[in-house]
């Protein structure tokens, strides 16, 4: 996202073992494809043994091709997607600033999931999220799903959707009493 730079862990620590996947960035979760980057040959052999012991790493035949195409040939598409997601984030921030004054949107660093502090409008975010489901027909996740202490007072909004759908959901939320 603008103002943030991705720093690969392998640059920070050459001995790091990096596990990643194109599934979120390139919407390829159905291919169940990921990769492991490990520079130490002995450790790599141990990893290979461990993941093959129960045959848990059967490769989908389309997965490696999709992974290579995603990482090598999709930079323009990813840049455009990130631009759209950033537009959704700014639309969220603008809407909140005008209509949901007790919400505070946290800075977005590198994801399509917005973290929103709603502690000023409710005492119990899980109850508030249930109210949003019942009255606004909008399903948001309470922050405590992602950490009982660190998530307290927050909810999470998925920005990977059409902007019209995001704005419609926000308008429905603004129309109910908190």
Regions found by a protein language model. Name each.
Residues 1-28:
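Active-site pre-lysine segment of PLP-dependent enzymes
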Residues 41-42, 61-80, 95-100, 118-120:
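Amphipathic alpha-helix from the class-I
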Residues 38, 42-62:
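Active-site C-terminal subdomain of aminotransferase-like
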């Amino acid at each position: 996202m603008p103002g943030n730079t991705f720093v690969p862990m392998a640059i920070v620590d050459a001995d790091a073992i990096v596990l990643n996947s194109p599934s979120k960035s390139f919407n390829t979760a159905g291919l169940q494809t990921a990769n492991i980057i490990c520079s130490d040959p002995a450790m790599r052999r141990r990893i290979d043994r461990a993941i093959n012991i129960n045959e848990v790493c059967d490769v989908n035949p389309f997965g490696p091709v999709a992974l290579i195409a995603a990482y090598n040939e999709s930079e323009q598409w990813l840049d455009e997607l990130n631009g759209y997601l950033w537009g959704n984030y700014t639309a969220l921030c603008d809407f909140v600033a005008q209509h949901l004054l007790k919400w505070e949107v946290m800075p977005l660093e590198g994801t399509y999931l917005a973290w929103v502090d709603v502690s000023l409008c409710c005492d119990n975010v899980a109850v508030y999220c249930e109210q949003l489901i019942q009255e606004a027909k909008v399903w948001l996740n309470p922050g405590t799903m992602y950490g009982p202490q660190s998530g307290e007072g927050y909810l999470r909004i998925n920005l990977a959707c059409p902007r019209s759908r995001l704005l419609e959901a926000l308008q429905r939320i603004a129309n109910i009493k908190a």
